[in-house]
Regions:
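Entry beta-strands of beta-propeller and related beta-repeat scaffolds
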Residues: 181-187, 227-231, 266-271, 314-322, ...
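Conserved Ser/Thr-centered positions that define the repeating blades of beta-propeller domains
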Residues: 197-202, 239-241, 280-281, 333-340, ...
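Beta-strand-rich domains and repeat architectures in extracellular enzymes and scaffolds
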Residues: 163-191
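Blade-level signature of beta-propeller repeat domains, shared across WD40, Kelch, NHL, RCC1
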Residues: 409-452
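Predominantly extracytoplasmic/ectodomain segments of secreted and cell-surface proteins
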Residues: 18-173
Length: 452
């Protein structure tokens, strides 16, 4: 009988400290960290004094805003959301610690365990090992505690010049770029002939030039819709699987000619046709003239468009078409119902060319989605890079201050595209430069908190 009781106690002790997260505190052999909360921490920041000297000041960080995740399966404790830059992780305090047993921390010097006092400031500049000792004096469990802090400012942007003096871009003009999966496409004109240059996002310094047929293709009209490219040639709709060889689309209904392709969504292909905005939901085979809410002008002189996910519902997308009519800025928006239940027309948003944050007057506009906002660029009259503009109100207000732009000179044509890793590529003809940059926080990875 005594032997059976001894075996049962050992089994209970082992159950209390196994690696399954569903373990409950049912025996004296239980040894789990149930909760752990960071306390008030110090954050040291730099500033310049009036005399120009660098000085440091300290602010408080509420540690509880950065919850600690407990991975019972792999015996790890960490904060998914890193502490802000400058937080002093050498002096970490805890405002709460709940465990089924005594908690000790391994010394960085001797390697021995000492009782952890949550009121003490502890050095977590490197991951530390804590051990929970059960009340039976036998069972224990170790955890690696990793207090993470950002090493870079979230809203800062770092640019890298990945290429310079590329001969393939020496004489290309009217650049227009797209990214498809991991391939960069830069369409343009070389003399009067359309070309496309391609590179992999992993090696944006290596580009391959391809001549395009037919020779009348409008390089600036190219859009990606579904798994194909669409563009215009002599105002007629063309399609391609590789961006190099193009064939006419056999349209059975719609306009006789197109002015420009201005957007592509999950289902909708959008175009300007004279004084109309038209759309197709069958890959350009048939077209419908869309309703306009006013007689305001369309952007027939300089234009760009974009379709992106709606913030209202996953069943909707938002379409934006903007540009210039003469020297006047123009903005139109439309909601697209992916279910096909409702059909909405285009709404004109009057713009004031003299208002702060107005649409910049540029040529060869490029429009992309970035950081849940609209990213706009274009060329100045001489073809040089026109800068980066960001709009968080769907094209009504444009500001440059959010995006740091590299110093670019010598460009005779420039365009922008964005890849799936949130990198912005600035591609410059003439100088043959390619720049790549990203807002730091858009490169941060979110760790899974569902453990198996």
């Amino acid at each position: 009988m005594a032997l059976m009781l001894s075996a049962l106690l050992m089994l209970m002790a082992n159950v209390g400290c196994n690696t399954k997260s569903e373990v409950e505190d049912l025996t004296s052999g239980a040894c789990l960290v149930k909760a752990m909360t960071l306390g008030t921490l110090n954050r040291h920041l730099h500033t310049l004094s009036r005399s120009g000297r660098d000085s440091i000041y300290t602010v408080k960080v509420t540690g509880s805003l950065y919850p600690l995740t407990i991975d019972q399966v792999n015996q790890r404790i960490f904060n998914v959301d890193s502490l802000p830059v400058g937080t002093d992780v050498k002096k970490i305090v805890f405002s709460g610690l709940t465990a089924t047993g005594s908690v000790a921390i391994q010394s960085k010097v001797t390697g021995k365990d000492t009782l952890l006092n949550q009121k003490d400031s502890i050095d977590f500049s490197t991951p530390r090992i804590i051990t929970v000792y059960a009340t039976d004096g036998v069972s224990n469990r170790k955890y690696q505690v990793d207090i993470r802090v950002h090493k870079e400012w979230g809203d800062s942007m770092i640019w890298q010049r990945t290429a310079s003096g590329l001969s393939a871009f020496s004489s290309v003009r009217q650049l227009h770029a797209l990214t498809v999966e991991s391939t960069l496409y830069a369409f343009g004109l070389e003399g009067t002939m359309p070309v496309v240059l391609t590179a992999n996002t992993a090696s944006p310094q290596q580009w391959t030039r391809h001549a395009i047929t037919p020779a009348t293709l409008d390089a600036h009209s190219v859009v990606r819709h579904g798994n194909r490219f669409f563009a215009l040639a002599s105002n007629q709709l063309m399609t391609s699987t590789d961006g190099i060889n193009w064939n006419p689309v056999n349209s059975t209904g719609g306009p006789n000619s197109f002015t420009q392709l201005v957007g592509s969504g999950t289902k909708h292909l959008l175009a300007l046709s004279g004084a109309s905005l038209v759309s197709s939901t069958d890959g350009g085979k048939t077209w419908t003239a869309d309703a306009l809410d006013s007689s305001a002008p369309l952007p027939l002189d300089e234009n760009a468009g974009l379709v992106f996910a709606s913030t209202v519902s996953k069943n909707y997308e938002k379409a934006v078409v903007l540009g210039l009519r003469g020297n006047e800025p123009v903005l139109w928006q439309r909601d697209l119902d992916l279910s096909g239940t409702d059909t909405f027309g285009w709404i004109n948003f009057p713009l004031d060319a003299h208002r702060r944050g107005h649409l910049p007057t540029l040529q060869n506009y490029t429009l992309a989605r970035y950081d849940d906002a609209l990213l706009l660029t274009g060329e100045k009259n001489d073809g040089s890079f026109g800068g980066l503009y960001l709009s968080r109100d769907n094209g009504y207000t444009w500001l440059q201050k959010e995006l740091k732009t590299p110093a670019i000179s010598g460009a005779t044509s420039a365009t922008v595209t964005v890849d799936a890793q949130n990198y912005i590529y600035i591609i410059c003809a003439g100088s043959g430069e390619v720049w790549r940059g990203r807002i730091n926080r858009l490169g941060w990875k979110n760790e899974d908190t569902l453990f198996k």
